[in-house]
Amino acid sequence: MIEMRKSGDRGTANYGWLETYHSFSFGKYYDPDNVQFGPLRVLNEDFIKGGKGFDTHPHQNMEIVTYVLSGTLEHKDSTGGEGLIKAGELQRMSAGSGISHSEKNASETEDVHLMQIWFVPEKEGIEPGYEQKEVSKGSDFFNSVITKGGGENKMDINQDITVYVGDLSSGDSGSIEISEGRLGYLHNSMIGTIQVNDLKLEPGDGLKITGPETLAITAESDSRLILFDMAP
């Protein structure tokens, strides 16, 4: 089963320095039909103005993935981790027993466009952790970048999830399966337009998927996608 989540149906807010879109209930936005999907709790698409960002704030017992689509994000946390997350890079942070961090646009003039995703963890109270990875446009249609247990060129995560990203050029096509007993969520970032089976996804559209389903995807323009294959 596939259910469309239209970009225009998302929650949105504009604070001047931050323009944000919420696929699931977040902050002042509440949608009883979109509180959570499997372990996927938050999927925000953010545009942060130059020199601005989120001051130091705490998290606990949440797996947080940040995917920077354009610009550069500066990260600092209470474990001593700090660095720059550049366009095309992902960061995975396990909040576990507790972590505080800040995220700010590293540029004074250029906006940062990013997706931030929160997953409910499999185990609570673990030691906080942090990983970062550059995603190169390889031969695979989708790159598997995060999975439980990690692996070669993959980051670990405290949940039964695999995260795929697709950096597609116009005309690229391929397919991917969500198996029976699994859930999937595909988000088409606010960059390009894609076709998935008989559905046209405009920028910001998403799909809730209950397996088994095969997704045949064609990029109608240059596009950036993220897909989660999850336990229910």
Predicted regions and their residues:
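A short glycine-rich, His/Asp/Glu-containing loop-to-beta-strand
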Residues: 14-58, 63, 114, 121, ...
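Tight coil/turn sites that cap or link beta-strands
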Residues: 45, 50-51, 88, 96, ...
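Histidine-centered metal-chelating micro-motifs
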Residues: 53-55, 72-75, 91-92, 96-104, ...
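Glycine- and acidic-residue-biased ligand/ion/polar-headgroup-sensing regions
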Residues: 60-79, 87-90, 170-171, 176-198, ...
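Generic beta-strand structural signal
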Residues: 63, 83, 89, 99-101, ...
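Short acidic-glycine-tyrosine-enriched beta hairpin
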Residues: 79-94, 137-139, 196-216
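Ligand-binding loop in jelly-roll beta-barrel domains
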Residues: 95-125, 210-232
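A short secondary-structure junction signal
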Residues: 102-104, 125-133, 154-158, 176-178
